[in-house]
Curated annotation (Swiss-Prot):
Ferritin-like diiron domain residues: 1-145
Keyword Hydrolase: no
Binding site for Fe cation 3: 49, 126, 130
UniProt GO molecular function: ferric iron binding; ferrous iron binding; ferroxidase activity; identical protein binding; iron ion sequestering activity
Record's subcellular location: Cytoplasm
Functional note: Iron-storage protein.
Gene name, Swiss-Prot/TrEMBL: ftnA
Name of the protein this chain belongs to: Bacterial non-heme ferritin
Effect the entry attributes to changing residue 49 to A: Initially reduces Fe(2+)/O(2) stoichiometry from ~3 to ~2
Length: 165
């Protein structure tokens, strides 16, 4: 049985994953608007992936006999000055998610909630991959610079980049 503190924290994380999905969907819209179709497709796939992260938490809460609580989610930021700025923000967001997952895993361990700690290990591993993925995109954008040709090739690569890297 989950302690009330863990139920609250799992619900918070579930809602943060929902926000992540909406954020990446909004970023996808920005990319589409600015004709970065490869980046838009990549971010749409990533938005779907974040929704599966939310669903895993939702299912864990119900599987443990608890009620998931979906809260009102704030509108994600929608304006960026460049593709580089947008991906800098994705990286910062993934760092925030990593911090929150680590805090959640720590709370599970502190509360001797070993089943939840075990469940969260998938997220710990996933966040390592997420940060690595977005850091690699930022590095490529930095190498490409602001030239149209460089951005074109990065955008083209993003269209084929698997979110499960």
């Amino acid at each position: 049985m989950l302690k009330p503190e863990m139920i609250e924290k799992l619900n918070e994380q579930m809602n943060l994953e929902l926000y992540s999905s909406l954020l990446y969907q909004q970023m996808s819209a920005w990319c589409s608007y600015h004709t970065f179709e490869g980046a838009a497709a990549f971010l749409r796939r990533h938005a779907q992936e974040e929704m599966t992260h939310m669903q895993r938490l939702f299912d864990y809460l119900t599987d443990t006999g608890n009620l998931p609580r979906i809260n009102t989610v704030e509108s994600p930021f929608a304006e960026y000055s460049s593709l580089d700025e947008l991906f800098q923000e994705t990286y910062k967001h993934e760092q925030l998610i990593t911090q929150k997952i680590n805090e959640l895993a720590h709370a599970a361990m502190t509360n001797q909630d070993y089943p939840t700690f075990n469940f969260l290990q998938w997220y710990v591993s996933e966040q390592h991959e997420e940060e690595k993925l977005f850091k690699s995109i930022i590095d490529k954008l930095s190498l490409a610079g602001k030239s149209g040709e460089g951005l074109y090739f990065i955008d083209k690569e993003l269209s084929t980049l698997d979110t499960q890297n």
